[in-house]
Amino acid sequence: MKTFSAKPAEVTKKWVIIDATGLVVGRLATLVAMRLRGKHLPTYTPHVDCGDNVIIINASKVVLTGRKRDNKVYYHHTGFIGGIKERSAKAILEGRFPERVVEKAIERMIPRGPLGRVQMGNLRVYPGAEHPHEAQQPEKLDIGAMNRKNMRAA
């Protein structure tokens, strides 16, 4: 039997919606990264974007285990000398764009490169319950029911 290799024209993409309320960030990110890459499919091909389109709602209500909410630090650089800045996960989750914690966790699990950037484009993260993708009729995916460790009381 010959090895199957998916062609970009043969790939059919599904739309999946995930409610992130009470979900542990790392566990959510691993499952979403796998879906974005298409590794949950038997027809997975490493060099083709064969993953699903993923919508995450209520991203501001995710949970970090242990003391990570206070102690985890996110760094960025302004580009100027001595311009390294840091913010805690708590500051980001309580700030203007709380969905960035989830986006960064997923982004760091996707390979860097042209294909990784395309796959990250298939991710939509919203801090609240509203999203503009009703026309795509997304299929609901309950990550909390997959494993009891995926859910944590806030």
Swiss-Prot record:
Q: Which Gene3D superfamilies match?
A: Ribosomal protein L13
Which residues pair up as cystines? Answer: none
Q: Which domain of life is it from?
A: Bacteria
Q: Which Pfam families match?
A: Ribosomal_L13 (PF00572)
The family database entries (InterPro entries) matched by this protein are listed as: Ribosomal_uL13, Ribosomal_uL13_bac-type, Ribosomal_uL13_sf
- GO CC annotation terms, alphabetical: cytosolic large ribosomal subunit
| Annotated GO MF terms | mRNA binding; structural constituent of ribosome
Q: Tell me one GO biological process term.
A: translation
Q: State the UniProt keywords alphabetically.
A: Ribonucleoprotein, Ribosomal protein
Q: How does it assemble?
A: Part of the 50S ribosomal subunit.
Which protein family is named in the record? Belongs to the universal ribosomal protein uL13 family.
* NCBIfam families listed in its UniProt record: rplM_bact
- The protein's role, per its UniProt record: This protein is one of the early assembly proteins of the 50S ribosomal subunit, although it is not seen to bind rRNA by itself. It is important during the early stages of 50S assembly.
Question: What PANTHER family is this protein classified in?
Answer: LARGE RIBOSOMAL SUBUNIT PROTEIN UL13M (PTHR11545:SF2), RIBOSOMAL PROTEIN L13 (PTHR11545)
Q: What is this protein called?
A: Large ribosomal subunit protein uL13
- Which organism is this entry from? Rhodopseudomonas palustris (strain TIE-1)
Taxonomic classification: Bacteria, Pseudomonadati, Pseudomonadota, Alphaproteobacteria, Hyphomicrobiales
